Amino acid sequence: MLSLDQIPHHIRHGIVGSRLIQIRGRVTQVTGTLLKAVVPGVRIGELCYLRNPDNSLSLQAEVIGFAQHQALLIPLGEMYGISSNTEVSPTGQCIRLGWVNICWGRCWMV
């Protein structure tokens, strides 16, 4: 059996840093343009994918806060089709706007 020391650094880094299970949540409430969803482990500024298994809805949303163990999300596109069946999948990434990275309430040059 191989130990981690026998695996090249770039491959080892990919193995150690990868998610082995895909975390998903579900939309629980929609008020205006604000979505509430139960999604374990998300962070403020993180992008999530919104998908409906029963139609072609697929768009991104940003986590902007939390309320009573639910994530508050703002969709980045047309909301038509969002329902209680909408799955929320965190990406682990933040918004990238050209030369600036915006993530977790901070802004820095790329």
Curated annotation (Swiss-Prot):
InterPro entries: ATPase_F1/V1/A1_a/bsu_N (IPR004100). Gene3D superfamilies: 3.40.50.12240. One of its GO terms (biological process) is proton transmembrane transport. The keyword Metal-binding does not apply. CDD domains: ATP-synt_flagellum-secretory_path_III_N. Keywords: Plasmid. Induction: Temperature seems to play the major role in regulation of transcription of the lcrE-containing operon of pYV, whereas Ca(2+) concentration has only a moderate effect at 37 degrees Celsius, and no effect at room temperature. This is Uncharacterized 12.2 kDa protein in lcrE 5'region. It comes from Yersinia enterocolitica. The lineage of its organism: Bacteria, Pseudomonadati, Pseudomonadota, Gammaproteobacteria, Enterobacterales.
